């Protein structure tokens, strides 16, 4: 166990420790503090991330203690060789392509991510963390970044109410705030999938029924919900790679070891919505469940027939059907393809980055260049649903909270 040296002990008896992995943190503490209805914060999923090759070069956990009690936990992901063209959109990637060919090292951006690589950001705590806890955490984050020579530091995808307790400490440490892509959340509570469809507005309801008919009219297609999908791992990876080849960003790319690890665990509870054309897998949506929440986490599609057979929509319909049958109160989906998800009835959940750089000149450049670039990318992703207020404006109205 390594102790963060600078600001390790606060005036109220708090101390900060840096733990090397999820197994170093007591299970009871994690389960008490993690959101009970968000499967992306299940301990098992973090363990699967650590044992696979999603992209980070390392993981760590900042733990604030007061005596024997755990007051706060903040997961960290360390990227030593992250490339800028992995985290920008396709338009920016095309502009960077000549530089990537000639001087690829210039695109290297060592980065420390704080929060959850695969989900919404949180500081795990019994309640909103207090001023001293936040100050200690932010100071410890910067200590880790300096020690590991990771110049850029990002608190990733925090909802406004999660970021608010940290805001003063972050501002004092030189962080600035940029709106990130929103999460998508579908509120449930219907007794059946048909009741869900009936409650949709007229146009989305007609479109949904039309897409379901188109799927059913195509010979040989069927949907199955699988608990055991070990025999399908090569096919899953192939379909997922088809999707990632068209993706705007490739920060976190799951691999065969992640899928195999998830398949072998009971935590989180998982189901695979699988679509077959005769005996051939042509689409899937990997879903996780915890408490009254579900997440459609990763999708794969055979683009040979995806459009004509409406595969994207129908695996999502089946996931919604499954979540309703499981008694879920909401299901979340990925931060992509917003228009189809809005037609499903999803809310947009506002999220933010807090960012800085350890050195003043790069920090000033980031502060000047990133907000307009990310705002433009957000506008392209959301179209008419893009927020109307500047992404750097403090106290912006929330999409849904």
Range-by-range predicted roles:
Residues 20, 26, 35, 39, ...:
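Proline-rich intrinsically disordered, low-complexity coils
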Residues 57-60, 65-66, 77-177, 293-353:
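Acyl-donor binding region in acyl/amide transferases
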Residues 2-13, 78-79, 120, 169-195, ...:
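Active-site/acyl-donor-binding loops of N-acyltransferases
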């Amino acid at each position: 166990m390594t102790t963060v040296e600078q600001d390790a002990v606060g005036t109220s008896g708090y101390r900060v420790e840096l733990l090397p992995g999820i197994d170093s943190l007591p299970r009871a503490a994690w389960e008490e503090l993690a959101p009970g209805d968000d499967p992306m914060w299940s301990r098992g999923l973090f363990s699967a991330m650590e044992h696979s090759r999603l992209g980070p070069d390392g993981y760590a956990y900042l733990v604030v203690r007061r005596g024997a009690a755990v007051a706060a936990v903040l997961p960290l992901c360390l990227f030593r060789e992250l490339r800028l063209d992995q985290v920008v959109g396709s338009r920016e990637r095309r502009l960077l392509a000549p530089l990537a060919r000639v001087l690829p090292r210039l695109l290297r951006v060592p980065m420390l991510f704080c929060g959850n690589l695969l989900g919404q950001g949180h500081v795990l705590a019994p309640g909103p963390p207090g001023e001293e806890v936040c100050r200690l955490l932010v100071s410890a984050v910067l200590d880790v970044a300096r020690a590991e020579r990771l110049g850029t530091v990002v608190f990733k995808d925090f909802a406004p109410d999660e970021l608010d307790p940290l805001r003063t400490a972050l501002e004092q440490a030189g962080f600035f705030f940029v709106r990130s892509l929103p999460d998508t959340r579908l509120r449930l509570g219907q007794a059946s999938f048909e009741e869900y469809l009936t409650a949709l507005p007229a146009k989305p309801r007609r479109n949904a029924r039309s897409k379901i008919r188109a799927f059913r009219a195509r010979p040989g297609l069927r949907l199955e919900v699988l608990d055991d999908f070990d025999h399908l791992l090569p096919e899953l990876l192939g379909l997922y790679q088809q999707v990632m080849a068209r993706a705007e960003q490739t920060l976190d790319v799951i691999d065969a070891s992640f899928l195999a690890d998830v398949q072998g665990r009971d935590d989180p509870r998982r189901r695979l919505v699988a679509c077959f054309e005769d005996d051939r897998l042509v689409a899937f949506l990997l879903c996780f469940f915890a408490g009254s929440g579900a997440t459609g986490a990763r999708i794969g599609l055979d683009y040979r027939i995806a459009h004509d057979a409406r595969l994207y929509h129908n695996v999502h319909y089946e996931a919604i059907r499954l979540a309703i049958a499981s008694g879920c109160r909401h299901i979340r989906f990925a931060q992509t393809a917003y228009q189809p998800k809005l037609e499903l009835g999803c809310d947009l959940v506002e999220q933010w980055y807090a960012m800085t750089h350890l050195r003043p000149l790069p920090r000033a450049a980031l502060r000047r260049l990133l907000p307009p670039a990310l705002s433009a990318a957000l506008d392209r992703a959301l179209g008419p649903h893009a927020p109307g207020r500047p992404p750097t404006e403090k106290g912006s109205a929330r999409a849904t909270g």
